[in-house]
A protein has these predicted regions:
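Conserved, mostly hydrophobic/aromatic
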Residues: 109, 144, 148, 169, ...
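Flexible glycine/acidic-rich beta-alpha junction loops that bind and position SAM and/or redox cofactors
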Residues: 3-14, 29-37, 160, 184-210, ...
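Flexible, glycine-rich loop/tail regions that form catalytic "lids" or insertion modules at the edges
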Residues: 22-27, 123, 131, 139, ...
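Glycine-rich beta-alpha loop elements in corrinoid/cobalamin-binding modules
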Residues: 1-86, 388
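N-terminal pre-triad scaffold of radical SAM enzymes
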Residues: 123-152, 182-185
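Conserved SAM/AdoMet-binding glycine-rich loop
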Residues: 174-313, 317-321
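Conserved alpha-helical substructure of the radical SAM core
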Residues: 157-185
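Ferredoxin-type iron-sulfur electron-transfer modules and their immediate structural context
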Residues: 49-134
Length: 423
């Protein structure tokens, strides 16, 4: 994030240094026009040259290679300077990321006297509707070591967790309560993943995040220090936010799931397994199917123990790179068997800075160095999405078409396993 760089740039400008000479600040990118830049920096082990702009335009393999280098240089401890030759003796140079804020600094940033309102220029149009969803929410953490392929948070906030103090959250909550539009409860307390409140392990603090593996994928790292004790303490003051179920399962105490089910779910828990097919989950960098099924069993058992009828609403993504129509069918069968009715299904669309988008464009998974099937045909994307909402009458024709293409007419009928009725 930009707090440290902005302050350092301001100090440099105040000292009379020209903008073109401010090239040392972490978390910034600058233009280098020295034609001998490569030669003069050939000795620098902390500089890594990316494939040139011309190279990544002509070669998807080099594009994927460039993405992977950038993806592995997002931590302030281990990241190198990166340089890409743009042409005409111009290099784009990216300095290593800024150091994460300390807890005191994070508290200070979020306790500044913000207006908590949209700009007055929007008032004639009725304001900004999206603001209502977040106005009475608290940001508790920054950073995420979840590593989902379709998320750009690794680039924006890094994999190291920074969290605010409970006292700071309470002070901000008191300000929210005083707002004339406050309706009685705080909607959300969290961040990218609410139950990440601390770095994933002690090693991360000393040596930075690992560049050779991720914290939760393909399985939870044995060095993970899953601890929900501080988060549980905060929950006793606030309403539950979104959680990461594989990290919850790594907490051997089991206390967090008990606390969650007993006090912090208002009937339904929203979770995001994203898919069920291991073929797709591999590309998403999400835990495999068995992990979600284990969580479902534990969640059901805990609610039975405390005598509550509480349900689960899963979120899914259709047409993600790697997803075939067969995978969509597998997910539909799972949903039918387990009685899930998806509340939200998002058709994958590419967004800047994500591993999934790199796969979408190149057809290559750079982390696995493998070719990937990309469902880009509009008709197939319609079929995949319809399969996930097979229960909707308006999707019946599309579901039947998909099942016939797959040779799964056994799922068309009136039986308990059928996804759709005949015409």
């Amino acid at each position: 994030m930009g707090e440290h760089p902005v302050a350092e740039i301001a100090e440099a400008l105040r000292s009379g240094i020209e903008v073109k000479d401010i090239t040392w600040i972490r978390g910034t990118v600058y233009k280098e026009t020295n034609p001998d830049f490569e030669k003069e920096n050939s000795w620098d082990e902390e500089l890594e040259l990316l494939p040139s702009f011309a190279d990544i335009c002509r070669s998807k393999e080099l594009y994927a290679q460039s993405f992977l280098i950038q993806y592995r240089n997002t931590d302030s401890v281990s990241a190198k300077r990166l340089a890409e030759y743009y042409g005409k003796n111009i290099y784009v140079v990216q300095n290593p990321p800024a150091e994460p804020l300390t807890r005191i600094e994070l508290d200070d940033v979020y306790e500044l006297p913000y207006q908590r309102a949209c700009h007055p220029s929007y008032e004639e149009e009725g304001g900004v509707p999206a603001l209502r969803e977040v106005k009475f929410s608290l940001t508790s953490v920054r950073g995420c070591f979840g590593g989902c392929s379709f998320c750009a948070l690794t680039f924006h906030q890094g994999r190291r967790i920074q969290s605010r103090s409970k006292d700071s959250l309470l002070r901000e909550a008191r300000l929210l309560i005083e707002d004339s539009e406050f309706k009685g409860y705080i909607h959300d307390v969290g961040g990218p993943t609410a139950n990440f409140r601390r770095p994933s392990c002690e090693k991360q603090l000393r040596h930075g995040v690992c560049t050779h593996r991720e914290c939760l994928y393909p399985t939870v790292c044995p060095n993970i220090e899953a601890d929900h004790s501080e988060y549980i303490d905060i929950l006793r003051a606030f309403i539950r936010s979104g959680i990461r179920f594989d990290y919850m399962l790594a907490d051997q105490s089991g206390g967090f799931l008990r606390e969650l089910c007993e006090h912090h779910i208002s009937g339904t828990l929203k979770v995001a397994p994203e898919h069920i097919s291991d073929n797709v989950l591999k590309r998403m960098h999400k835990p495999d199917r068995s992990v979600f099924e284990r969580f479902c069993r534990k969640y059901e058992a805990e609610n039975k123990r405390i005598g509550k009828k509480q349900y689960m609403i899963p979120y899914f993504i259709s047409s993600h790179p790697g997803a075939t129509l067969e995978d969509a069918c597998e997910l539909s069968v799972f949903l039918k068997k387990n009685g899930f009715v998806p509340d939200q299904v998002q058709d994958f669309y590419p967004t800047p800075g994500t591993l999934s988008t790199c796969m979408f464009y190149t057809g290559i998974d750079p982390s696995a160095k493998e070719r990937v099937y990309v469902p880009s045909d509009p008709e197939e994307k319609r079929l995949q999405r319809a399969m996930l909402h097979f229960n909707k009458p308006e999707n019946a024709d599309l579901v039947r078409k998909a099942l016939r293409l797959l040779g799964r007419t056994d799922l068309i009928g009136y039986g308990p396993e059928a996804l759709v009725r005949p015409e």
